[in-house]
Structure formats: structure tokens, C-alpha cells
């Protein structure tokens, strides 16, 4: 009986070693794979809002989009992580509420909870990259006070110099950055992890220091995330009409730079706020790789 028990014990130990080895290999493979998660960071009901005509000079014929998605994105690469934008505040109610901007905001899922569920809680994020400092992209800044945070220097200066009537810049939203311990001000493009997988690149126009994101995925291929260079695909005609004589750094040239990068890398353009594209995206815990 004892030899049988010893053989069973040895067999169990071998199986356990095999399982643990397979688990280690799986974890190693997961770390080597670049993954992109889409996170729910709010929704904006913009029915009747004339902000694109009032603030950006679009013609009255500009198409009216009744709603915009407001996703954030988590990139995991070689065991490191980058969060793109911080969305509406987790304090935003789930029922749409009218704000002083004339837009109804709502939030179904809190960003902190989504990150926690993916085992990347806010305090463990390696990088936070912000497309720009308008309030709908930075609502959860207080979670990331000790995270390396990437913004363009021009954007930081524009926010600090903004007057009370400047659309989008809200001191209550961006002031937490003043307490950040690892704020990194960029003066151009950055290969974030040094391996060409994730790049932030300047696209000034919507704001003076706006930036967009490129993520190279092995299976899906390259994805270019627009930020607010463009809000929805139907905007293209109106944007071109409004910006025929735009100077460098204004919307038309930013859009041209965005399209140039998409074409250069053979990428797929994700219009961040576009509600139609958003419905086709798979959200976390599913991912792209």
C-alpha cells in the first residue's frame, strides 16, 4: 500500500509542477502580449447643443449629433500599463443630469472599479496619458496623483492661462495636477515604453497641446485613437468647411496630421467620442491584442 501511496504522491507532485509551469508560461505570454481594453468613462447627451458652431466656428449646417460616447482606454504592454484619459468623474450619476454646459452627463460604471476588476487598480497604473485637459477627459485625476502622467507642455500652459469663458477648461477639474508627484510635460511625441508599441503624438488644434495615441497590436494591427481632433465621423464635412483657411495647429491641420499617421502605419482610426464606432467596440473585460 505504501509504494502505491508514494507513487500517487509523486504523480500528484508532477501534475502540480506541470500546472504551475503552464501557469507561469501563460502569465509570461500575457505580459508579452500588448492588450487594449476599452473602458466606460461616461456618456454625454448633447441634443440641441450648439457648441460646435459657437465655440469652434462650424457653419450652421454642421450636423448635430445627439449623443457622444466618452471611453477611456487601458493598454497593457510587457507587464506595464498606460491609461488613456480619465473620463467623467466617478461621482457622475447614472441618470443623466444637466450641467452648466448644457449637456446631460451620465456614468454607468465607475473607472476605479473597472480598473480594479482588471487587476490594474489606479495606484498600480504605470502611466496616465491625457489627450487634453478638458473636463470630460480628466474627471478622475485624484486617483492618479502618484502615477507618471503625460501631457504636452503647451496644454498645461493653455489650461492655466484659460479665462472663465474658455470652453472645456475647468480649474476644478485640472487643479489636482498641481499636486501630482510625477507630472511629465512633453514637447513633442513620445514612444512611451521604448519598444514602438505605444506612442503619444502631438495633434494641436482642438486645444493648443492636444495629443493622440497609437497602439500597435500584434493580431488586430495598429490603432490610432483620435482624442478630440475629431468627435464623430459625420463631423468631417463641417470641419473641412469651417477650416478651409486654418493655420497650422488649427483643426484642419491636426486632422491632416492624424490621417497622415493612420496612413503611414496602415492603422485603424478610432474616433474616440463617435457613438456609432463605440457601439461596435468590445468593452472590458474583453480586449484587443
What kind of feature is each model-predicted range?
Residues 1-12:
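Bacterial N-terminal signal peptides that target proteins for export
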Residues 41-42, 86-88, 133, 154, ...:
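Active-site metal-binding loops of divalent metal-dependent hydrolases
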Amino acid at each position: 500500500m505504501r509504494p502505491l501511496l508514494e507513487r500517487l504522491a509523486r504523480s500528484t507532485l508532477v501534475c502540480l509542477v506541470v500546472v504551475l509551469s503552464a501557469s507561469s508560461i501563460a502569465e509570461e505570454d500575457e505580459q508579452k502580449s500588448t492588450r487594449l481594453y476599452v473602458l466606460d468613462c461616461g456618456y454625454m447627451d448633447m441634443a440641441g447643443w450648439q457648441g460646435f458652431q459657437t465655440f469652434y466656428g462650424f457653419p450652421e449646417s454642421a450636423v448635430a449629433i445627439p449623443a457622444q460616447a466618452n471611453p477611456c482606454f487601458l493598454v497593457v504592454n510587457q507587464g506595464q500599463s498606460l491609461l488613456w484619459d480619465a473620463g467623467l468623474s466617478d461621482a457622475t450619476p447614472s441618470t443623466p443630469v444637466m450641467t452648466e454646459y448644457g449637456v446631460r452627463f451620465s456614468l454607468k460604471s465607475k473607472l476605479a472599479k473597472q480598473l480594479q476588476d482588471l487587476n490594474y487598480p489606479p495606484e498600480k497604473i504605470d502611466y496616465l496619458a491625457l489627450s487634453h485637459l478638458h473636463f470630460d477627459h480628466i474627471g478622475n485625476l485624484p486617483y492618479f496623483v502618484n502615477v507618471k502622467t503625460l501631457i504636452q507642455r503647451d496644454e498645461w500652459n493653455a489650461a492655466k492661462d484659460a479665462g472663465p469663458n474658455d470652453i472645456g477648461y475647468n480649474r476644478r477639474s485640472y487643479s489636482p495636477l498641481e499636486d501630482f508627484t510625477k507630472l511629465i510635460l512633453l514637447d513633442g511625441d513620445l514612444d512611451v515604453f521604448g519598444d514602438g508599441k505605444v506612442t503619444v503624438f502631438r495633434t494641436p488644434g482642438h486645444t493648443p497641446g492636444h495629443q493622440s495615441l497609437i497602439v500597435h497590436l500584434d493580431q488586430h494591427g495598429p490603432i490610432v485613437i483620435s482624442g478630440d481632433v475629431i468627435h464623430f465621423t459625420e463631423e468631417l464635412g463641417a470641419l473641412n468647411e469651417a477650416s478651409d483657411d486654418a493655420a497650422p495647429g488649427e483643426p484642419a491641420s491636426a486632422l491632416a496630421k492624424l490621417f497622415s499617421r493612420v496612413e503611414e502605419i496602415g492603422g485603424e482610426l478610432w474616433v474616440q467620442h463617435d457613438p456609432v464606432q463605440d457601439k461596435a467596440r468590445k468593452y472590458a473585460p474583453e480586449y484587443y491584442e
